[in-house]
Amino acid sequence: MNILLANPRGFCAGVDRAISIVELALEIHGAPIYVRHEVVHNRFVVDGLKAKGAVFVEELDEVPDGAIVIFSAHGVSQEVRQEAKRRDLKVFDATCPLVTKVHMQVARASKKGTKAILIGHEGHPEVIGTMGQYDNQDAGIFLVESVEDIAKLPVSSQDDLTFMTQTTLSIDDTSDVIEALKEKYPAIQGPRKNDICYATTNRQQAVRELAKQSQLVLVVGSKNSSNSNRLAELASRMGVPSKLIDGPQDIDPSWLDGVETIGITAGASAPEVLVQSVVEHLKTLGVTGVSNLEGCEENMVFEVPKELRIHEVK
């Protein structure tokens, strides 16, 4: 029995940046540092930051006035930003720059009075933050999760209409939704290419190749990680059994019955140390070989805020 590792896998530039922001803030200012929402959707990462003194909260009313707070990689609404300013909170913003790019698209649409349609998953923190960039009551922003939702849209005119997407969606599903939107609203405007980020795109492509050569695909990632879920779904759609796992403790040995090659990948918020712990555990269950699938190289780096960057250099 062999293991085939997907490439690329694991941390993306936005996740690296978000974790660095929390760690540097703790190093400079000391604990406690408050973080609104899980800074990235991975239990192992969050538990590690908690151990260093990070305090994770869901809303700003849990943060003392004047304290330091970090916004998660998923971004926040304008209302949250205004509340932080009103309460004199010191903010370090760990919003992924690629999410911020979508925020700016929504804010521009709001300012122009252009109706906006966001393709995304209801209730996901990124979607809540992105929807919260729109404040034009005369137009409006509407959420679409699937092709079926398009028929329910309360939008009759295609004039001054634009769409955006969450950054961590299924490429195939999103393409179907965009195609259906353009069929119903031929004049709808949108980004030149969808807003799905490079890391999501690369990891989904890697899983396609992985699934072709595996009888089982394990995706290392937490249950609340959107991009990790999409990886597991993609492998399943290709006819390969797939499991989303937090770590080796989640592996059921019966999954390995009749399997010759186990494909392993990791969501953009899952650290490589978890992948290696899964590999080591599988070796105790009969794996004898480990190889890497060739894939594209990622060189993207996002800088931390200037105040933290100066300290990092020192």
Curated annotation (Swiss-Prot):
Cofactors (names): [4Fe-4S] cluster
Reactions the enzyme catalyzes: isopentenyl diphosphate + 2 oxidized [2Fe-2S]-[ferredoxin] + H2O = (2E)-4-hydroxy-3-methylbut-2-enyl diphosphate + 2 reduced [2Fe-2S]-[ferredoxin] + 2 H(+); dimethylallyl diphosphate + 2 oxidized [2Fe-2S]-[ferredoxin] + H2O = (2E)-4-hydroxy-3-methylbut-2-enyl diphosphate + 2 reduced [2Fe-2S]-[ferredoxin] + 2 H(+)
Species of provenance: Actinobacillus pleuropneumoniae serotype 3 (strain JL03)
Record-listed isopentenyl diphosphate binding positions: 41, 74, 124, 225-227, 269
Active site positions: 126 (proton donor)
GO biological process: dimethylallyl diphosphate biosynthetic process; isopentenyl diphosphate biosynthetic process, methylerythritol 4-phosphate pathway; terpenoid biosynthetic process
One Pfam assignment: LYTB
HAMAP family: IspH (MF_00191)
Highest taxon of source: Bacteria
Biological role stated in the UniProt entry: Catalyzes the conversion of 1-hydroxy-2-methyl-2-(E)-butenyl 4-diphosphate (HMBPP) into a mixture of isopentenyl diphosphate (IPP) and dimethylallyl diphosphate (DMAPP). Acts in the terminal step of the DOXP/MEP pathway for isoprenoid precursor biosynthesis.
Residues that coordinate or bind (2E)-4-hydroxy-3-methylbut-2-enyl diphosphate: 41, 74, 124, 167, 225-227, 269
EC id: 1.17.7.4
Coiled-coil annotated spans: none
Protein name: 4-hydroxy-3-methylbut-2-enyl diphosphate reductase
Family: Belongs to the IspH family.
UniProt pathway annotation: Isoprenoid biosynthesis; dimethylallyl diphosphate biosynthesis; dimethylallyl diphosphate from (2E)-4-hydroxy-3-methylbutenyl diphosphate: step 1/1; Isoprenoid biosynthesis; isopentenyl diphosphate biosynthesis via DXP pathway; isopentenyl diphosphate from 1-deoxy-D-xylulose 5-phosphate: step 6/6
Gene designation: ispH
Top EC group: oxidoreductase
GO molecular function, one term: 4-hydroxy-3-methylbut-2-enyl diphosphate reductase activity
Disulfide-bonded cysteines: none
Binding site for dimethylallyl diphosphate: 41, 74, 124, 225-227, 269
